[in-house]
Amino acid sequence: MDNNYLDASHRKRLVCSNCNGTNTTLWRRKAEGDPVCNACGLYFKLHHVTRPIPMKKNKKHAVLPAPGISKL
């Protein structure tokens, strides 16, 4: 079986190792292999830091810049 594709029953049991979310359009994995939701995975890929938990909402959210990045 190809490990890149998780069956539906396994996907339902996944919990994001960063925000503890259980609902996402796509599951990703950290370098250590732990599952992360799409939002946390993309935030880390872009900012190289874990996504702050206060950003987690039950509804859609805006992506905030990483700490230390100023607006012009």
Swiss-Prot record:
<comment type="function">
    <text>Probable transcription factor. Plays a role in regulating heme-dependent expression of heme transporter hrg-1. Modulates lifespan in a daf-16-dependent manner.</text>
</comment>
<keyword id="KW-0863">Zinc-finger</keyword>
<dbReference type="GO" id="GO:0003700">
    <property type="term" value="F:DNA-binding transcription factor activity"/>
</dbReference>
<dbReference type="InterPro" id="IPR013088">
    <property type="entry name" value="Znf_NHR/GATA"/>
</dbReference>
<dbReference type="GO" id="GO:0005634">
    <property type="term" value="C:nucleus"/>
</dbReference>
<feature type="zinc finger region" description="GATA-type">
    <location>
        <begin position="16"/>
        <end position="40"/>
    </location>
</feature>
<dbReference type="Pfam" id="PF00320">
    <property type="entry name" value="GATA"/>
</dbReference>
<keyword id="KW-0539">Nucleus</keyword>
<keyword id="KW-0479">Metal-binding</keyword>
<dbReference type="GO" id="GO:0045944">
    <property type="term" value="P:positive regulation of transcription by RNA polymerase II"/>
</dbReference>
<dbReference type="InterPro" id="IPR000679">
    <property type="entry name" value="Znf_GATA"/>
</dbReference>
<keyword id="KW-0805">Transcription regulation</keyword>
<dbReference type="GO" id="GO:0003690">
    <property type="term" value="F:double-stranded DNA binding"/>
</dbReference>
<keyword id="KW-0804">Transcription</keyword>
<dbReference type="GO" id="GO:0008340">
    <property type="term" value="P:determination of adult lifespan"/>
</dbReference>
<protein>
    <recommendedName>
        <fullName>Probable transcription factor elt-4</fullName>
    </recommendedName>
</protein>
<keyword id="KW-0862">Zinc</keyword>
<dbReference type="InterPro" id="IPR039355">
    <property type="entry name" value="Transcription_factor_GATA"/>
</dbReference>
<dbReference type="GO" id="GO:0008270">
    <property type="term" value="F:zinc ion binding"/>
</dbReference>
<dbReference type="GO" id="GO:0043565">
    <property type="term" value="F:sequence-specific DNA binding"/>
</dbReference>
